[in-house]
Amino acid sequence: MTITRQDAWTQDEDLLLAEVVLRHIREGGTQLSAFEEVGRALTRTAAACGFRWNSYVRKQYQSGIELAKKQRKELRKQIGVHSVNMPNSMKQTASASSEGKRDLSIQDVIQFLEQFKETPSAQEFQLEREKLKEQIQSLQKELEDLRSENQTLRNQLEMTEEDYKALIDIMDRARKMVVSKEDGRMKKAAQET
């Protein structure tokens, strides 16, 4: 009698995982968002779904992955918009219309434009980029100032060490002179006696 794990993956769960991941690949979404979606449906963690996909399921769907990538490429060509900047709901609308599954209505266009308005604009990205550039320049200037201060302190330390060594040498010579004078006096006193 073999014992199976309580949390073992079933064929249906593997199939759901494959379908969702392939759909996300086709629509230009990320695998992580696919794993999160499957995780919610199966009450598993996204990490568990990712592990199952990478360790077992993906190997069985290589041709499906290639086909999904090809479809995504074709969809991008037809739409003329990079789906990286589009939310999933917009991708689904664009996907459906480009494949001829339905005609666009005014409501679809309005919905698309409202969602498009909510996505960060190129101007916002540019402003964020400029802000980050300024931060980098500020940090580089601060780093340069700290390096300069560090070099100044090193130079001062080196000069102090040299002065200290010179002072020790002078004191050593003075001590030797005092010792030699005392030795001279003692010898002279010894000779006189």
Swiss-Prot record:
Induction: Transcriptionally regulated by sigma-E. Transcription also requires the transcriptional regulator SpoIIID. Keywords: Activator, Coiled coil, DNA-binding, Repressor, Sporulation, Transcription, Transcription regulation. Disruption phenotype: Disruption of the gene does not affect vegetative growth and has no apparent effect on production of heat-resistant spores. However, the mutation leads to a considerably reduced spore resistance to lysozyme. The mutant shows some changes in spore coat morphology. The development of outer and inner coat layers is not completed. The synthesis or incorporation of several coat proteins is affected. The mutant has a strongly reduced germination efficiency compared with the wild-type and the complemented strain when L-alanine is used to induce germination. Residues 122-177 form a coiled coil. It comes from Bacillus subtilis (strain 168). This is Sporulation-specific transcriptional regulator GerR. Residues 35-57 bind DNA. Signal peptide: none annotated. The keyword Repressor applies. The keyword Acetylation does not apply. Pfam families: Myb_DNA-bind_6. Residues 1-61 form the HTH myb-type domain. NCBIfam families: DNA_bind_RsfA (TIGR02894), PRK13923.1-3 (NF010535).
